[in-house]
């Protein structure tokens, strides 16, 4: 049975520097081992920049036995998906969050 799902994710990205010229991160959905068309996102993460929050959501058709994954790639090995501690009394900050919710 195929149903509609809202798929949302966020990544906390950081480029601490240390070499390399690239600043690009791409993220995309993969369903059953195949990249989902038109699901890629590209963002720049500048060296020594503050943390960048990349977020996106999709409405996609998913079957009960489908396997859904999120992939990412960067052209600079120093760029990280990074968790952090809360510094203002709040809880820790997760590196990645993904939510999948049935909408139809």
Residue ranges and their predicted role:
Residues 2-104:
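Extracellular jelly-roll beta-sandwich "head" domains, especially the C-terminal globular C1q domain
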């Amino acid at each position: 049975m195929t149903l509609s799902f809202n798929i949302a994710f966020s990544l906390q990205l950081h480029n601490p520097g240390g070499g390399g010229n690239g600043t690009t991160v791409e993220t995309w959905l993969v369903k059953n081992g195949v990249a989902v068309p038109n699901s890629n996102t590209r963002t720049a993460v500048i060296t020594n920049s503050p943390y960048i929050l990349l977020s996106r959501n999709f409405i996609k058709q998913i079957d009960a036995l489908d396997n859904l994954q999120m992939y990412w790639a960067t052209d600079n090995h120093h760029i990280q998906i990074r968790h952090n501690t809360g510094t203002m009394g709040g809880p820790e900050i997760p590196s990645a969050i993904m939510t999948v919710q049935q909408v139809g």
